Amino acid sequence: MTREEARAFALRWLPAWTGNNPSELAAYYSEDTFYCDPGIPNGVKGREALLGYFQKLLAQNPDWVWTQIEGIPMEDGFLNKWHARIPVGSKIVECVGVCFVQLDSNGLIRRNEVYFDRTELVKEISKARKPAT
């Protein structure tokens, strides 16, 4: 995969993370996909299980926005350096992280592992959930 191909894929795929449409997002993944992120470090296997996770995750974060900073080609895919703007209560948490994206022969994601420091995000979620005193 070239840098241009990685960028083109990210321009189609990353917007599907916004707007709480888990079926649209899951359609980018193969039937036997593997996905993990800091919230599920052991990951999920298979599109059906991933869809269940996405239904919960996207419902909690319908307005977050993910954009690519850089795509670095690797075997069968790319390393995606990304930026996320995540609304939490009245604050916007900004995160930079990486994930690797490996595609199958049909151009669907067969492996997606997401890594970032979620310290600030967890702190803001905890503050937003505390009842006002």
Give a label for each model feature.
Residues 54, 66-72, 83-84, 96-102:
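Hydrophobic/aromatic beta-strand elements that line small-molecule binding cavities or substrate pockets
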Residues 34, 91, 107-108:
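Residue-level signal for well-ordered, solvent-exposed loop/turn and beta-edge residues enriched
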Residues 1-4, 127-133:
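Basic/polar N-terminal segments that are highly enriched at the extreme N-terminus
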Residues 31, 88, 105:
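Short, ordered coil/turn segments that flank beta-strands lining enzyme active or ligand-binding pockets
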Residues 96, 100-125:
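Short beta-strand edge/turn micro-motifs at domain boundaries
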Residues 59-60, 85-94:
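Short, cysteine-centered beta-strand-loop-beta hairpins and adjacent loop/turn segments enriched
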Residues 3-4, 15, 22-75:
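A solvent-exposed, acidic/Ser-Thr-rich amphipathic alpha-helical stretch
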